[in-house]
């Protein structure tokens, strides 16, 4: 769909007389006071990454010393879903600094007693892909407290891990979930301790002090449901149910998944997908990932995101679009709809079903990868149902001469059919809601500020800004019951920095009773010297019985006047100057202090009969009467030794009767010459050297001081007949001797496995001079010519030339490469040649590894069963070494006897289609072996031990006799948990009355005696 577009422009008033009546369309909502209620320091030792921002090219150079290098970003504490409230407590998660500590921490602040209790967990941040020398900012700690049973829940320190990736470093530890016993959240400070959290005592526990659980269901057999997840975020529904959402998969092939907490069983459900990943498998033309959030707002589970497509040849460098959906199911398990309330496919496959708008439409670029839509994206929904998105779009290349950038605010007021999109928005990274308002909360010069607007509008007003106190580096926040809980890290130094909590009261209660105040418009533009500006203020109370006592007007925070009678009119004929106007009647003396050029803020404060106040603001822009002056262009580039440069200046006055007296040119602050006649021209034939040129006519002597390579700022100052001045600037870049093209590989080192099917690489090549173009890019392999490419894009190894990097080929039309690259190290060189004949080169190392077999693991731990068992199934997780290799089959053997060979996933035995194939095993131990074979003919295997014991054999002697009967009776008396199969009399419990049933299966006579 096409969203409604609306670009807002201030109205420029060309007449000198203005009269604003109460009928003028426009509105600015009244607001009560927003105040900092409390600030408290939580710790001095929050972990922060203070080293280098690494990438895949220098990942092996991490600092082993004190500096903490990082991947993705420097923030990990006061980051992510790290602050929540429960009753009168505020809970905060963080990692302990410095670099050698890294423990997971949980702090609880009691707002009544002002005390802080902190728990230190044994787990330490494992670092980027398991390297503790490199911090990873994505490994945040998600936090929730159940309002229904006081349990605390944390998911942390993970980024799409599973048993097999990153060299198996996260085997049996790829998901980290910790939870407390009931009512731990309320305990006194001295009892708020680590032992209130439940240890992992499963067969894959990491040790006696392991508080991390790999599954949230309570069953480690479900662990595969918790693999490859990132970005934990908890929600609380209107009835107190906890939900958790995470991202499954990667950047351009992912899904949002969520699950639910059951207070009765104190376990969580398995994850449910909002959308499918691997969307091509479900008929979509491409795979896509999500960059945004799932949120529970206004009583519903919702999603809002930008899409990152696997199509790398569209005009978007990374993300595109704005997408939105919501669920009418109380916990999101179905009934999903788009913003038009149309039902959508669930799980979602085609994202176009929920597309709202395309930010890329707000700039003009159409070339491949020319549009950049990353960052400054968020969304929210108000209590009454206004939907708001903020986003940013810009040119990918910041250096291009036609660079474009727009901040967008797209909103759909409750009850509206379409979204309104405005570029009259200064931008933000997050947007929040409380009640019917929307908020922007952030840091300015390191201190918090709050801006607020009524939902369904773009009328943002700054209602709070701190001007003193600590200077902060970053923070994350949570809004609850009209208060902002802003969790912040102070900007100091090192890898252990202080953490603070600020509680900011949004004063929603007072706002509900506050008078409603409105200017005729939220903004206005006038010309300098305007004669009349009459402002009628509308002030009313929505509370029955209340009246407006007064309206006070302020101009730039200076008191103008208080009016106590309707109409509340300022700048009328008796007081023409109070709004900055000159005056318009014959009896009006000219204003001795008119408003000068620039922006000015009018503020109206209304007081009602109960003393409650409301305010509104209006921005007035006064345009200057100074001359208008401009160069033809803002940037000129020439080559060193240029012969001619004539520079003209356009200067005029917008005020009738005024003329331009002179224009003076300065270069790098040094005066060149003043010109008093049109055209205002420098560097003409009579003065060829004044702009740094050599001269171009035979009668021109060579310039003894020509401009050398560098940057020069030309400034023109125009003066009009009233002595008013304006200036403008232009930059001249003098290029030195031409430099060769810049050519780069996406990665300087690429590693593949022998037999790889596909390797295509696009080379970046750019001429150093703006006047030159790239004519060709030539590829060499181990110093042998591969191909000369003369057409952009510089793409090698594509489907029409699949063998250029030694690959086998991947399409049905590709014959197998007769000379593939074998295991070893190979050097590739590209040479870019520009239109001036200059050449630049770059090298790439291709490492071909010997073929590796697939990775395979059983999804189950070792199994123990008793004879007579009724069901048994096992499954394997199998992955190839890379996407170019496929699995041919997985076969299961029991003690080297083939059970069945599976030719396609899922690789399960004993499933519904083959329920009996693993039954009837006799007493003994069996080796279950799964063997996987891939298209490289590589084989890997994994084994599982299955032990079958005799039903009723308690002493392990392979028969059932009186000794076993006595052992059974003893177990009953001591209260041991026994298998439900021993409930012989089928009364629902295993007790002494079942002893007779055991005697009936004795394998020896006189068993009961």
UniProtKB/Swiss-Prot annotation:
This is Ulvan lyase, long isoform. Ca(2+) 1 binds at residues 200, 210, 212. The keyword Calcium applies. One of its GO terms (molecular function) is metal ion binding. One of its GO terms (biological process) is polysaccharide catabolic process. It comes from the Bacteria. The lineage of its organism: Bacteria, Pseudomonadati, Pseudomonadota, Gammaproteobacteria, Alteromonadales. The record marks 247 as: Neutralizes the sugar carboxylate group at subsite +1. It comes from Glaciecola sp. (strain KUL10). Ulvan lyase involved in ulvan degradation. Ulvan is the main polysaccharide component of the Ulvales (green seaweed) cell wall. It is composed of disaccharide building blocks comprising 3-sulfated rhamnose (Rha3S) linked to D-glucuronic acid (GlcA), L-iduronic acid (IduA), or D-xylose (Xyl). Ulvan lyase catalyzes preferentially the endolytic cleavage of the glycosidic bond between Rha3S and the uronic acid GlcA, but not IduA, producing oligosaccharides that have unsaturated 4-deoxy-L-threo-hex-4-enopyranosiduronic acid (deltaUA) at the non-reducing end. Keywords: Calcium, Lyase, Metal-binding, Signal. InterPro entries: Dockerin_dom_sf, Ig-like_fold. Belongs to the polysaccharide lyase 24 family. Its EC number is 4.2.2.-.
């Amino acid at each position: 769909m096409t969203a409604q577009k609306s670009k807002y422009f201030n109205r420029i008033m060309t007449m000198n007389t203005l009269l604003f009546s109460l009928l003028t369309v426009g509105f600015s909502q009244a607001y009560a006071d927003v105040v900092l209620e409390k600030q408290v320091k939580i710790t001095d030792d929050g972990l922060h990454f203070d080293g280098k921002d690494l990438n895949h090219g220098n990942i092996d150079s991490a600092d082993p010393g004190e500096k903490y290098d990082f991947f993705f970003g420097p923030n990990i504490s006061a980051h992510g879903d790290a602050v929540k409230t429960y009753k009168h407590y505020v809970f905060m998660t963080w990692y302990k600094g410095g670099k050698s500590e890294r423990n997971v921490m949980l702090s609880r602040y009691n707002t009544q007693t002002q005390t802080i209790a902190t728990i230190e967990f044994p787990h330490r941040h494992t670092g980027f892909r398991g390297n503790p020398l490199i911090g990873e900012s994505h490994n945040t700690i998600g936090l929730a407290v159940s309002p229904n049973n006081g349990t605390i829940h944390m998911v942390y320190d993970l980024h799409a891990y599973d048993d097999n990736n990153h060299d198996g470093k996260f085997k049996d530890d790829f998901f980290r979930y910790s939870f407390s016993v009931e009512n731990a959240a309320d305990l006194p400070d001295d009892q708020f301790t680590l032992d209130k959290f439940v240890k992992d005592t499963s067969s894959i526990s990491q040790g006696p002090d392991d508080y991390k659980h790999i599954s949230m269901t309570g069953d480690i057999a479900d662990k595969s449901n918790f693999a490859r997840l990132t970005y934990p975020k908890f929600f609380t529904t209107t009835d107190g149910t906890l939900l958790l959402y995470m991202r499954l998969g990667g950047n351009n092939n992912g899904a949002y998944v969520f699950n639910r907490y059951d207070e009765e069983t104190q376990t969580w459900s398995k994850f449910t997908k909002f959308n499918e990943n691997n969307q091509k498998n479900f008929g979509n033309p491409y795979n896509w990932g999500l960059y945004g959030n799932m949120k529970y707002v206004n009583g519903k589970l919702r999603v809002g995101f930008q899409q990152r497509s696997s199509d790398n040849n569209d005009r978007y460098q990374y993300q595109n679009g704005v997408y939105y959906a919501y669920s009418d199911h109380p916990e999101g398990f179905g009934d999903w709809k788009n913003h038009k309330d149309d039902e959508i496919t669930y799980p979602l496959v085609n994202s176009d079903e929920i597309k709202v708008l395309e930010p890329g439409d707000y700039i003009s670029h159409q070339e491949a990868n020319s549009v950049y839509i990353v960052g400054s994206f968020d969304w929210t929904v108000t209590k009454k149902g206004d939907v708001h998105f903020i986003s940013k779009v810009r040119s990918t290349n910041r250096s291009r001469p036609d660079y474009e950038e727009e901040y967008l605010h797209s909103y759909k007021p409750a009850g509206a059919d379409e979204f309104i999109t405005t570029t009259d928005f200064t931008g933000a990274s997050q947007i929040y809601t409380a009640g019917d308002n929307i908020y922007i909360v952030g840091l300015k010069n390191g201190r918090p500020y709050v801006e607020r607007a009524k939902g369904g509008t773009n009328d943002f007003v700054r209602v709070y800004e701190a001007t003193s106190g600590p200077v902060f580096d970053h923070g994350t926040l949570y809004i609850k019951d009209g208060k902002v809980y802003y969790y912040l890290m102070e900007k100091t130094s090192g890898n252990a920095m202080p953490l603070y909590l600020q509680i900011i009261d949004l004063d929603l209660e007072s706002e509900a009773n506050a008078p409603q105040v409105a200017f005729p418009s939220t903004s206005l533009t006038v010309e300098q010297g305007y004669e009349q500006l009459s402002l009628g203020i509308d002030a009313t109370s929505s509370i029955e019985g209340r009246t407006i006592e007064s309206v006070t007007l302020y101009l730039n925070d200076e008191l103008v006047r208080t009016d106590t009678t309707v109409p509340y009119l300022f700048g009328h004929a008796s007081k023409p100057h109070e709004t900055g106007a000159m005056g318009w009647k014959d009896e009006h003396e000219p204003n001795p202090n008119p408003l000068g050029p620039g922006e000015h803020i009018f503020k109206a404060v209304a007081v009602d009969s109960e003393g409650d106040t409301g305010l509104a603001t209006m921005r007035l822009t006064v345009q200057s009467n100074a001359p208008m002056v401009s160069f033809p262009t803002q940037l000129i580039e020439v080559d060193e030794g240029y012969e001619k440069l004539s520079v003209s200046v356009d200067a005029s006055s917008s005020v009738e009767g005024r003329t331009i007296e002179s224009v003076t040119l300065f270069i790098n602050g040094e005066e060149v010459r003043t010109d008093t006649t049109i055209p205002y021209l420098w560097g003409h034939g009579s003065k060829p050297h004044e702009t740094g040129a050599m001269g171009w006519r035979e009668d021109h002597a060579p310039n003894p001081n020509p401009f050398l390579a560098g940057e020069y700022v030309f400034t023109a100052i125009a003066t009009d007949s009233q002595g008013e001045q304006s200036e403008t600037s232009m930059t001249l870049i003098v290029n030195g001797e031409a430099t060769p093209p810049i050519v780069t590989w996406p990665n300087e080192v690429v590693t593949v496995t022998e037999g790889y099917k596909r390797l295509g690489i696009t080379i970046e090549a750019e001429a150093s001079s703006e006047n030159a173009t790239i004519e060709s890019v030539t590829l060499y392999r181990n110093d042998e010519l591969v191909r000369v490419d003369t057409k952009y894009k510089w793409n090698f190894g594509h489907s029409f030339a699949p063998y250029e990097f030694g690959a086998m080929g991947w399409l049905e039309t590709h014959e197998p490469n007769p000379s593939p690259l074998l295991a070893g190290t190979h050097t590739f060189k590209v040479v870019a040649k520009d239109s001036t004949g200059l050449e630049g080169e770059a090298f790439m190392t291709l490492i071909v590894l010997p073929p590796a077999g697939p990775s395979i693991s059983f999804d189950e731990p070792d199994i123990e069963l008793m004879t007579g068992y009724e069901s048994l199934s096992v499954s394997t997780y199998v992955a190839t070494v890379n996407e170019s290799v496929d699995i041919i089959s997985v076969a299961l053997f029991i003690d080297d006897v083939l059970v069945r060979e599976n030719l396609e996933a899922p690789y399960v035995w004993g499933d519904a289609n083959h329920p009996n194939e693993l039954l009837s095993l006799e007493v003994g131990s069996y080796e279950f072996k799964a063997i996987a074979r891939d298209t490289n003919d590589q084989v890997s295997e994994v084994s599982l031990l299955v032990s079958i014991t005799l039903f009723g054999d308690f002493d392990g002697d392979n028969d059932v006799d009186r000794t076993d009967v006595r052992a059974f009776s003893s177990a009953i008396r001591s209260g041991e948990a026994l298998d439900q199969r021993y409930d012989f009399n089928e009364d629902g419990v295993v007790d002494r009355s079942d002893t007779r049933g055991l005697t009936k299966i004795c394998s020896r006579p006189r068993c009961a005696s």
